[in-house]
Amino acid sequence: MTEEVGQKLLESLSLFKLGDIGYARIECELLTTFLEEQLENNLDSLSIHELSTNLIRNRICCREFIESRPAKKWVFLIFRLARTLFRDKTRIATFHSVNLHSEFVQVFWRNLTYQTKSYRNCKFQTFQFIASRFLRSEHDWNVTVVNCLNVTQKLIDNGENARKFVDCNLEDAVLVLLATRQMTVLQHSLEILGRLSDWSTTCRENLCESNTIDVCLQLIPDGDILTQKLCISLLRILSCEEQAREQIRIYDGVPTLLGLLSIKNSRLQWHVAWTLAQLAEQHETSLEIAQLGGISLIFAAISNPKPPGKAVGDWVAMLTGLTALLAQLAQASSNQQLMSNANGVYILGKLLAIKKNVTTDETIDSWDLLQCSIFRVLRLMYTFERSRQLLKKVLPTEIFEKFVDVGNYNSVLTDYDQIAKMYDNLIEENIEIMKDWETVNERRQAVGEVGEYELLDQLGAGAFGCVYTVRKKAQSHSENPAKLLALKEIFMTNLNDRESDKSFGDMISEVKIIKQQLRHPNIVRYRRIFVENHRLYIVMDLIQGCSLRDLIITMKEKKGNFEEKKIWAMVVQMMLALRYLHKEKQIVHRDLKPNNIMMTTDERVVITDFGLAKQKGPEYLKSAAGTIIYSCPEIVQNLPYGEKADIWSFGCCIYEMCQLQPVFHSTNMLTLAMQIVEAKYDPLNEMWSDDLRFLITSCLAPDPSARPDILKVSGMCGVRLLEYLDDVARQQASTSDMTASQSSYNIKIDESPSSLNSSTSSYKRPGRSSKTSGSGKLPPINPAPRRNHSMSAGETPRPSSIVCLPRITDKYSVMFPSAPSAIPSRRRVQTCSTEHPARSSSSTELKVSKQSDGLTVSSNVLRQIQDPVLTILNQIHRILVVTDKETISTSMNHQRRLVEMFRKNLLGRENDAVQMKTHLRKLAAESPEEIQMNLGFSDFRPVLVQSHINGYQKDQKVTKITYEQLSACIECLIAENPAAK
């Protein structure tokens, strides 16, 4: 019986009888019996091979079979048999040996794109039975399509076979299925696209030109774990292409990806990490990831990691991916600082011995790769001065030498292999070496107390004292963490009690001047001064940033140069600080150098270390102070000097920013002094502007009388100063507008639900229009304001005219039967004639004429009343027309995506009816107000360019879009789509 069924099925598949219903019914019965009883196990290999060949040639790759429009059950059984047979790789090889890939795609996939565009008008309907019918009736055809996709997925088993399918444009057809709501179909489609793009550059390029990235980013927030993994995996593969990375950035994909880092799933986190690592190759995206808190999220994921019970290999790969992302972020010096502030050195160091905490039977070859990746991040962080000090404390000498020899900004992972093996051997010999990392833990308990402050970490030390990071002792009633401050400790030794007290008094008086007077954003703020245990303590703001010296060293190690715009931004801020010190406070800093100029994380310049500052008196200062290579000729020659000493140091700092080396440098002190006195230095490179050259030359004038003061310096930089202030004003205006818009958006609108006219007039169009409601624009609701002229003797009144109101019909009584008294009597109202004396000088008298049949008025003086409900419905109709699913296009269209995101937000759960009405009325009025929604764009410039809209800065990001611009996009989409018209 078994052999008989198999033989009959083999014979049935060897031929095809067009239009024979009985033949189709018999084959369906044979297929059902064969599958349910699993008869393929009873056939010999030759019969199975023949069965597979007939199935391929005469069914799934046969155009005549498909054009006969077989029944759904028949197609389902055919693909179920194919799915069963293709579990064996030899039968998959049989399919590829037949070489009918093109026929398979054409028969089952090619016409899918035509069917989804307009399957009713398509003459060639070979896929209507499986594709177009599925899109129209997903539930009925779901299982059939899943089997078809599963078979296709099995056939894409290597790169060569994947490229054969790509040559037949299989990805274009599968892409359309991403519009389905059936999760199984969606996941199989994503898997197929991932396999094709992973093995084919052509496929990646084709998908980048489609809306694939947009679809994936929209599926991620609401999808399950498997869907999220498939979407992120596809994005990771496509991110090899620059076009894909640009699309992800434009579609605001970076925040979406960062939000997935906190999900405890190793494979998902691995995909996210490598996707972000590729995006972070662009400097701006790297900074954006850091600004969005990405560095903190990464360290939270790798600090105190707990190995899973199974799939440890995936877990190790995830840690490697996250450290690779950190390595890419560490290419930016500002990110190095954030990583150091996040206790990154300690967290990464403890991760080096994670292998000792894992017990597993799995053979994991990626431990060495993880250690190499960790050392690469630490080496990139080493270029930051703070991290350099910490790493010197913990790395053994023999390893530290190899560590330094790798070189700065070396991202080649294999160069760290020897270091990783050496350190791993040290751990094997003595696990106690890992305790050394506790000394660089900046989150440990306070190391001591001084007064009301807890000492957290030592920032630096010198001959006269130390500088600590401190915080106020926690208050029992306070839940907020204490603000971090800097505490400067000054030793007072070798003094008797009387001298010590006097010195304390003198020093406190000197610093009190600074504390009480200096209030400037570019100058460090001193908070408190106190004495304890024969030591002077100065509390000041902790500058979260790095010094100009660190920036110069980092840039020199990168073998690059600062952008001139950035140099001017720092120069202007330093000028503002010096003007404040010299002209308002009469203070000379006397030790202005790159080490004392800090750059915060938001690129604000802060001048610090006023230990040598002096307040100017009537006489010139005479004491020697400062670092000699930044000292002016007057100080070197021990001559009186004034505020222009700071101008000289200012010029030295600017020169060093440009050339990345001090303006005067020599190992011989006498030679160095001669260079300073004679102002002999190497000229600037030709790459710098004439303005910068002239500024440095003027500041480094050896004759103090020829050297300008800070006001003249500002005059030399007038144009640059105005450009900087213009940028600051623009940023403040943008921030202010955004805050104001957000505040107004959050205010609850108090209005009656039944009143549609009450708030219509509160949104005015920029201009008048004579278009009717069909245009989607609102006319002004309130009539023109009327003026009541007084009838005083001093005015010549104008002759009045009779005002006739339209007759009020009985419709009023029908609409409001409960209020008959509100119906006015029909009469003619006439204004008082001005030919008679007025009874009042401040009012207009109305005179009632005899009762007549009704009131009449000319129709041409009436203003047409427009139903606001129709206006709102018109906007809804326009939005639905351009986002109609029957007009699905797989091509990338920024405008359509914008409208779809607006519709999604408008109809979301967070919007109530009042907010929906407000948004639609603003859209109808083409309001210039910005839309306060997350529309999924980090930059709207591609949308505006595609819509040919002007009026924005083309060289700056456009992070918000107005209702007026959205309306223009909708009009463009309607104009481009004949069906929408």
Swiss-Prot record:
Keywords: ATP-binding, Kinase, Magnesium, Metal-binding, Nucleotide-binding, Serine/threonine-protein kinase, Transferase. Residues 752-762 have a biased composition (Low complexity). Residues 735-746, 830-847 have a biased composition (Polar residues). GO terms for molecular function: ATP binding; metal ion binding; protein serine kinase activity; protein serine/threonine kinase activity. Gene3D superfamilies: Leucine-rich Repeat Variant, Phosphorylase Kinase, domain 1, Transferase(Phosphotransferase) domain 1. The active site is at 591 (proton acceptor). It catalyses: L-seryl-[protein] + ATP = O-phospho-L-seryl-[protein] + ADP + H(+); L-threonyl-[protein] + ATP = O-phospho-L-threonyl-[protein] + ADP + H(+). One of its GO terms (biological process) is regulation of cell cycle G2/M phase transition. InterPro entries: ARM-like, ARM-type_fold, Armadillo, Kinase-like_dom_sf, NEK_Ser/Thr_kinase, Prot_kinase_dom, Protein_kinase_ATP_BS, Ser/Thr_kinase_AS. Its EC number is 2.7.11.1. Its cofactor is Mg(2+). It is an enzyme of class 2 (transferase). It holds the Pfam family Pkinase. Residues 735-802, 823-847 are annotated as: Disordered. PROSITE patterns: PROTEIN_KINASE_ATP, PROTEIN_KINASE_DOM, PROTEIN_KINASE_ST. Residues 453-725 form the Protein kinase domain. SUPFAM superfamilies: ARM repeat (SSF48371), Protein kinase-like (PK-like) (SSF56112). ATP binds at residues 459-467, 488. Belongs to the protein kinase superfamily. NEK Ser/Thr protein kinase family. NIMA subfamily. This is Serine/threonine-protein kinase D1044.8. It comes from Caenorhabditis elegans. The gene is nekl-4.
